[in-house]
Amino acid sequence: MSNNVGDSSARPDLELEEEFGEDDGTISEQEMAEAEAGCGQAAVAIPVGTSAGRPAETSSGASHPAGVGFGHPAGIPGGPSGHPAGIPGGPSERQRHGGARSVGFRPGGGPAAIAYQERTGIKAPRIIAWEITRSCNLSCVHCRAAAEFGHYDGELSLDQIKATVDDIVTISNPIIILTGGEPLMRPDIWEIVDYCHEKGAMPVIGTNATLITEDIAAKMAEHKIPRISVSIDFPTADGHDEFRAQPGCFDQTIAGIKMAKAAGVGVQINTTVTTRNAHLIEEIHDLAESLDVDAFHIFMLVPTGRGSEILAEELPPDEYEKVLTWAYHRQKTSPLHFKPTDAPHYYRIIRQLAKAEGKKVTREEYGLDAMTRGCLGGITFCFVSHVGDIQPCGYFDMQLGNVKDKPFSEIWTESQVFNDLRDYSLLKGKCGACEYKAVCGGCRARALEITGDYLEAEPYCAYEPPAWKGECSLDEAAAEVGVSTTGHD
C-alpha cells in the first residue's frame, strides 16, 4: 500500500492565475497549492508537461509477478514469474518548492467549483484519495487500513464509483488518487481511470509498484496516468522487506519504478518516517535521486490501523522537529520535488527557520509551500473508503457519511465534522492558542487517535506558543511572526 500528492512551483513555464473565481475557471496560487499539497493518503504531485500520454514500446511477453484469485491485477494476463531485469529510467521533469500540474489541467477549477463556493461559502475539494479496493498483496506493518490479500465484502461497484464521480464533478474537477490496498489489484482500474478523465477529474495512482510489469506500465501511459506514488522506507532490501512484510518486495518495487519511468510515467517516492529509519533518511533520499524520480515526500507515521501496533516507533516530538528541520535545509539543494506530508508542523518550522535566516516565506522564495497549510482534511481534501465511507483523511477514523446512501456533494457540504475542521477558531489546547494555527493546524487524525477529540491539541508537537504560556495575546504573537490566525499569510 502506498500512502502519499505534492505541489507545483518554481517552473518558469507554470502560469498560475492570480484570482479564484474568474469566468474561465482558473484558480489562485493558494487554491493550486491546496489542490496539490495533499493530505493523509497517497500524495502524488502532478508533473508539468507530463509525457504519460505517450506509451512506451513494451514486450508483449512481459510476465506478471503474481496471480490474483479474482482475476489478474489491472486486467493484465501473465503467470507468477518475476519482474524483468531493471529498465533504465527515462527523462524526468523536475519540480521544486510546491507542486506541479499537467498542462491544461486546473484541479478544482472550472465553473462548478466557482459556483459551489459562491453558493455555499465552502471551498470545493481539490484532491480526493479514493481507496478503490482494500485488497493488497503486502501486509505492511504501518498500514492504516490493515489491508490484506483477499476479497473484501461491500466494495463499491464500478457503477457506484461512476455515479459518485458524476456527483463530485458537479462541484469540482479534483485530482483523484486511486489508492488501496493495492489499486492495481482491481481489474477494472482502467475503466475507472478513463471515466475520471472523461468527466474532467485527474486520476493518479498510489501503488507499492510490486505488480507493475512492462504491460502495466504501458497501460498507465496509454490511460494518461501522469504520475504514480511508490513507497520506499529503507535504502536497502532487508529493512524495506521487513517493514513491508514481504521478502523480495524491495527489488520488485525498484523494478516497477524503472518500468514506469521507461514508459514515460512520472514517479514519486514516499517514505514513512519512524524510529526504525529516521537515521537513514538521507540515504533513502539519495536512492530516490539515483532512480531519477520526480519527487521525494516524507510521511510522518500516523498510528492508525496496523500503525497503532507500532506506536512506540512514532518519532517523539523533538525528533519529529529534527527531521522536519533537516527537510527544510535538504530541499534547498535536492534536485527532486521535496515535501513532508502528514507533517503540518513543517509549515510552522519553515516560517521559524526563514525568520532566523532573515527571510520572509513568499511564493518567490518558497514556492507553493508559502501558499498552503498543513492539515487540509475537510478543507480541500478528503478520503473515500473501499465501501464508500467519507472521511477527512484515510487516517481519520470517523465515517461522516456513505456515498451509497447520500451524495458525496451533500456530505462534503453538510457534515458537522467537516465544518468544524474548516473553523480554526474551534481548535483546543495549545493549537487553539498558537499563532501558526492557520498555516499548521496540527494533525487532526493524530489528535483523534490519541485524545479521542479531533479538535484537541496535536499530541506530537514540541512547540509551546507564547500565548499558551501567557506571555502575550494570540494576536500579538501572530503579528510578531507575520501570519494570520484566521487564514493564510
Question: Over which residues does each language-model region extend?
Answer:
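Cysteine-cluster motifs in flexible loop/terminal segments that predominantly coordinate metals
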Residues: 427-472
